[in-house]
């Protein structure tokens, strides 16, 4: 967690002056599922986009801190991240804005996360909630899902990755749409 963020911050600082690549030495490169749960037939994942790696991290992949990738994205820089398996240095995963190799199966990683919550809110009210979560609460552990229309009203859904956060902040969240 902390070392990933520090490496990302240093990469962001140095990228203008130097050709920067962040190499993170880990116990494993990225594989197709959690090796603590799936024991056999794990596939090596050679490349991921920033977005794929960030979402996989948010949903339980422990190999890289999703906030490190978020910081790179927010600063608008292109810095490749290389995850190197310390036991087998030839096993690497390259993470960058747009992966070079788009061949192969589109399903790369299977993850899972407990204790999530989905909030349904009228789409016209979501902007204020998202702005407040970002600025006031400094909370970003959520994903906005595809909107849908019911009875002529457009709704958005937010997947919160911490159900306890939603419980602790229920009044605050409902203040944006009491019918949510």
What feature does the model see in each segment?
Residues 1-180:
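C-terminal catalytic "cap/lid" subdomain
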């Amino acid at each position: 967690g902390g070392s990933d963020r520090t490496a990302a911050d240093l990469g962001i600082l140095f990228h203008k002056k130097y050709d920067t690549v962040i190499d993170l030495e880990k116990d494993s490169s990225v594989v197709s599922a959690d090796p603590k749960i799936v024991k056999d037939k794990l596939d090596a994942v050679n490349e991921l986009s920033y977005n794929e790696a960030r979402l996989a991290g948010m949903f339980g992949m422990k190999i890289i801190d999703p906030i490190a990738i978020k910081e790179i994205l927010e600063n608008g820089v292109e810095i490749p991240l290389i995850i190197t398996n310390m036991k087998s240095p030839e096993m690497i995963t390259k993470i960058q804005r747009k992966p070079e190799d788009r061949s192969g199966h589109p399903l790369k990683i299977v993850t899972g996360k407990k204790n999530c919550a989905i909030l349904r809110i009228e789409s016209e009210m979501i902007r204020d909630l998202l702005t407040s979560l970002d600025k006031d609460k400094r909370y970003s552990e959520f994903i906005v899902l595809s909107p849908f229309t019911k009875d002529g009203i457009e709704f958005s859904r937010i997947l919160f990755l911490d159900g306890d956060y939603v419980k602790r902040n229920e009044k605050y969240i409902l203040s944006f749409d009491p019918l949510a």
